[in-house]
């Protein structure tokens, strides 16, 4: 069973409220761009691909309801600008906004308002199918690359945060690799970190693993290095919110220390991400803007205080893993590339932000 984080049919969008998982399964209606922005900002929906898809689909829903009749191009532009500001570290929303805006402006030269409305909605709806197809390619490429180093054995994977069906339109990126290994009968075990402070691993990845029958074990973030030493980890596979030209990768905070530990233990470290998560306009990770989240997300859990009152808090949502630590490769829908190969492989295929 593949979990369904996004339910869409023309004019109607529902998202699985991931803040309530695994205790409750609740779908929230998204009726407008404002609803989409709030769902992204509050992390009801998260994961770089899903952020872009939900953001753009929220625009499609509002367009289908007749919004933007006076100046549709301006309405699309203003809506995309607003959506892009919700979570700036993830590149997918910004890239989708730029490409959709360029498409809208070009189409507006030849079509009336209602024809343009249909064209824009059609472009957005195609994102869903493209994302699932790209994720399946990522899963297959990643699984084959990992298995090429262990041709006869089952493999044990360590992952961080949540990168499965709940973070995409379906199938997943890093967890898509795990899914492909499982479908091939070659997954011995998945170790998933709890991923503090938002617990995406404990709440979401563990939820997906149980629902889909993966052999999986949950560990705390601080157990990862020990697991690498004691549990015969074959590879570490994580997702990405932004991969820049030299291969430096922004992902959920805690990824950097996993890469350091993997390097120490001689374990291949992979990043799995669609090419839409790659930003060739930035030369290195130093240029990535890192989102900082509210202190309350660290000092309390489900509204219950767990830290001493008055303590100062630093709560970055992401960290940057230097490309030198990505030893396995960067898994995309186009293939698996070393960081040094990425820019040449993607140049011409992407529109730089």
Swiss-Prot record:
Record carries keyword Amino-acid biosynthesis: yes
Q: A GO term (biological process) for this protein?
A: L-methionine salvage from methylthioadenosine
Instruction: Give the record's GO CC terms.
Output: cytoplasm; nucleus
One function term, GO molecular function aspect:
S-methyl-5-thioribose-1-phosphate isomerase activity
Task: Cite the SUPFAM superfamilies for this sequence.
Answer: NagB/RpiA/CoA transferase-like
Which UniProt keywords are present, listed alphabetically? Amino-acid biosynthesis, Cytoplasm, Isomerase, Methionine biosynthesis, Nucleus
Q: Where in the cell is it found?
A: Cytoplasm; Nucleus
Give the residues annotated as active site: 241 (proton donor)
**EC code:** 5.3.1.23
Q: Which reaction does it catalyse?
A: 5-(methylsulfanyl)-alpha-D-ribose 1-phosphate = 5-(methylsulfanyl)-D-ribulose 1-phosphate
Role played: Catalyzes the interconversion of methylthioribose-1-phosphate (MTR-1-P) into methylthioribulose-1-phosphate (MTRu-1-P).
**PANTHER family membership:** METHYLTHIORIBOSE-1-PHOSPHATE ISOMERASE (PTHR43475:SF1)
> What is the protein name given in its UniProt record?
Methylthioribose-1-phosphate isomerase
Organism the protein comes from:
Danio rerio (Zebrafish)
